[in-house]
Amino acid sequence: MSSSNYVYRNNFSDDDDITTAISDYLFWSSLAFSSREVAGNVFLVFESFKKDASLVFGNDLTAFVKNMFLDSKIGFEQSKIMINSMLKKENHIRESCAVIGILARAAEYWGGESSPTCSSMKVLVLLRDLVSDNDISLVKSALIIRLKRLNEKSIHLQV
């Protein structure tokens, strides 16, 4: 199992390391569902980024990630082109979150074992190649805002 710093976390602040949190999430996503640790709210919010991915990359995320062919070098290079071609640079926050969402879906599709596969771990290299420091800052802001909303909903449900 992963010795993740963020898998169990329910909160996230400006002092936390978003790059490590995303890497932990992508690693976790590459595991079979039966091999995943029960995650906290941080990963629950990261899961919501798949909705952003559906809006940016289309409703059939499985078909999209299947065509990434992460099990080949040509497919890996093509993946960068595919993802970049879908980014219109109109809603930077949504598109930044969508890239995380599509990479998580790719990690699931190309992983699914008790430990990450070579193909599923290529999403970490794609993360580095596709997501700028500015994009990472936008993802961090979106995560903090969505966590705040999630926590507010939880408080209202308890009352």
From Swiss-Prot:
Pfam family for this entry, one: Poxv_Bcl-2-like
Organism: Sheeppox virus (strain InS-1)
Cross-referenced Gene3D superfamilies: dsDNA poxvirus
Protein name as it appears in the record: Protein B14 homolog
Stated family: Belongs to the poxviridae B14 protein family.
Coiled coil start-end: none
